[in-house]
Amino acid sequence: MMLFSVRFISGFVFGAGSGVAALKLYYYEEQQTHTGSSVHRVIGRFGLPESGAESRFYTNHVLSYDQTHRTPRWVAEHLSSTRLLGEANRKQCKFRPDPSVPELFTAHNEDYLKSGWSRGHMAPAGDNKSSEQAMAETFYLSNIVPQNYENNAGFWNRLEMYCRELTEKFSDVWVVSGPLMKPQITDDGKKTVSYQLIGKDEVAVPTHLYKVILAQKDPSSDALAVGAFVVPNAPIGFQHQLQEFQVSVCDLERESGLVFFPALQKQQLSDLCTVDSCQLMDFRRFSLYISSRKMQSANSVYRLEKILAELQEAGIAPDEHLKQIYQQRRTELERRQDTNTHT
């Protein structure tokens, strides 16, 4: 797994999260050629400042952790139609500090409590149904940023779903996600960066979130398409299209201080939104999807009927798929109720 992970990350992101081995080799070569190497040895006699592991490897994702902000700098994933399969259930998962992050630099659940911000995944739980461990690791707070509730459950959720849908059209999809602090221009024309800190650990609330998507149609082909998107950490309605938030990879690299997919010649990449539609789920499809999820977890017939009524109040007629879920879940709940009555 380590060999795969090193190859995996070397082609994903270089910058704040560059490979430790490459850095050590660089410093070694510098020491061998620089005439002041003895001075450097004295300077580093008791060690040089450290910012933690540059890259952290997990079952199904890789990330670089920002010990100052208590959030990830970036989180990298690889998606395919087969890798998305599995039966892992998030009901068994709990948010908790990453055991690999020193206690001094980790966020805690208490930081988010009553903060007004949700715990937003960068590597989504929905991408990690392949194993219980892979899904559980996405709930480490090293993979989490303070995110607006509506954005998390709405637009960002739809963007994550779009990434998964791409695996139906492309053989391989790589995704890099993370937080961003964008400057604001004050009345006097000056640029300033301002962001909230929450909890006793002072977890930084990003002003924006980014996602870079790289898609390959055929493993035997060099044809690749890329799309970079920056969205505000705020509610975004259904009237907005994903293309409104598309930026050039170069501009995102300049703002983030990261270089994405450094092994590629980016000028040779196609635009994802030209190759594909970059179309997120509309209000109707998304409402049906959310209702189906709610029905599958409903614990009473009353709750099941309420979900159906809420959907109809929104003017959306259930499709055949939702009707099947409704009937199946209703039968299960009624059988459970009969069993409890006779025991």
UniProtKB/Swiss-Prot annotation:
Its cofactor is a divalent metal cation. Keywords: Endonuclease, Hydrolase, Membrane, Metal-binding, Mitochondrion, Mitochondrion inner membrane, Nuclease, Transit peptide. One of its GO terms (cellular component) is mitochondrial inner membrane. The keyword Glycosyltransferase does not apply. It is found in: Mitochondrion inner membrane. It is an enzyme of class 3 (hydrolase). The active site is at 121 (proton acceptor). A divalent metal cation binds at residue 152. InterPro entries: DNA/RNA_non-sp_Endonuclease_sf, Endo_G_ENPP1-like_dom, ENPP1-3/EXOG-like_nuc-like, Exog_C, His-Me_finger_sf, Non-specific_endonuclease. CDD domains: NUC. One of its GO terms (molecular function) is metal ion binding. Its EC number is 3.1.30.-. SUPFAM superfamilies: His-Me finger endonucleases. The active site contains 1 hydrated divalent metal cation that has only 1 direct interaction with the protein; all other interactions are via water molecules. Belongs to the DNA/RNA non-specific endonuclease family. Endo/exonuclease with nicking activity towards supercoiled DNA, a preference for single-stranded DNA and 5'-3' exonuclease activity. This is Nuclease EXOG, mitochondrial.
